[in-house]
Amino acid sequence: KSRLYFAVTVLMCAFVSINGVGLNDLLERASQLSDKLHSLSTSLTNDLDSHFPPVGRVMMPRPSMCHTSSLQIPNDKDQALKVPEDELLSLARSLLLAWSDPLALLSSKASSLAHPERNTINSKTKELQDNINSLVPGLEHVVHKMGSSSDNLSSLPFYSNSLGQDKTSRLVNFHFLLSCFRRDSHKIDSFLKVLRCRAAKKRPEMC
């Protein structure tokens, strides 16, 4: 855990002063941060699964209920390789920005979850927030380097400010939101790695 936190902190600091940094390096740093996002969300999911009530599986909403499910995106890497760079970057940014409010909600509720690993879950959720807060401005710099439009984003509003009225509902909805984020973080990571590969002029089969 401490090694992961140190690595994330170093990557965050790398985005603080990036004037003059080339596109390849910016995308490399962004890809490393997005990889950490996905790894951390996977670790959090495993923590939750360690003590998750059987009834929670029944109560869990379907993936199609994720607030980002309406966004039309490539289904796999082969499809992503056919999408123009500026569109792929806009998709990654749209997904990332869509998680600002949901992650703030998760972070505010993690410490009160009815779960024996809530302290660990709380700590990792705050790390997720820190990662997001670093990656968002990092991608803004990528936008400027690529000469893309910074306004070409999809609106994916999140309307809830509660996880539920009872401890089981709160745990289930926390898990559901996290599973949605884990799925989206994988997409963000995949899109940024394709962009990094293209910027490095690699052949598609090498990406």
UniProtKB/Swiss-Prot annotation:
The keyword Secreted applies. Coiled coil: none annotated. It comes from the Eukaryota. It is found in: Secreted. GO terms for molecular function: hormone activity. InterPro entries: 4_helix_cytokine-like_core, Somatotropin/Prolactin, Somatotropin_CS. Disulfide bonds join C66-C180, C197-C207. GO terms for biological process: positive regulation of cell population proliferation; positive regulation of receptor signaling pathway via JAK-STAT; response to nutrient levels. Belongs to the somatotropin/prolactin family. Residues 1-20 form the signal peptide. This is Prolactin. PANTHER family: PROLACTIN (PTHR11417:SF5), SOMATOTROPIN,PROLACTIN (PTHR11417). Pituitary gland. It comes from Hypophthalmichthys molitrix (Silver carp). The lineage of its organism: Eukaryota, Metazoa, Chordata, Craniata, Vertebrata.
